[in-house]
Amino acid sequence: MRLPAQLLGLLMLWVPGSSGDVVMTQSPLSLPVTLGQPASISCRSSQSLVYSDGNTYLNWFQQRPGQSPRRLIYKVSNWDSGVPDRFSGSGSGTDFTLKISRVEAEDVGVYYCMQGTHWP
């Protein structure tokens, strides 16, 4: 069964800082999916997100229709409490991916990547 819904959105962040603006770009803009099949969303940063402490502060958020956003993944690949293990995050430096191993109907929504490394 195909879900004719938008599974993700594009988020571009300009964060003023000493090393210049950080631009986050997601692709694709829209992703038709099939229940039970995998789905993948990419996120690219214009600068490395590796912080001076060695951590990479890349988060993934999900916003279901009519609901507030909730964080799914923090520091690239760590699950927040209650997040199903069909979600996984990976990547390093500037390139990151959110994968859903088996899409369920409740997964329909908008997905955002957000960096937390570079701040004004």
Swiss-Prot record:
Entries under SUPFAM superfamilies matching the protein: Immunoglobulin
Protein name: Immunoglobulin kappa variable 2D-30
Domain Ig-like per the UniProt entry, residue ranges: 21-120
Function: V region of the variable domain of immunoglobulin light chains that participates in the antigen recognition. Immunoglobulins, also known as antibodies, are membrane-bound or secreted glycoproteins produced by B lymphocytes. In the recognition phase of humoral immunity, the membrane-bound immunoglobulins serve as receptors which, upon binding of a specific antigen, trigger the clonal expansion and differentiation of B lymphocytes into immunoglobulins-secreting plasma cells.
Pfam families in alphabetical order: V-set
Region described as Complementarity-determining-2: spans on this chain: 75-81
Region described as Framework-2: 60-74
Stretches for region Framework-3: 82-113
Protein source organism: Homo sapiens (Human)
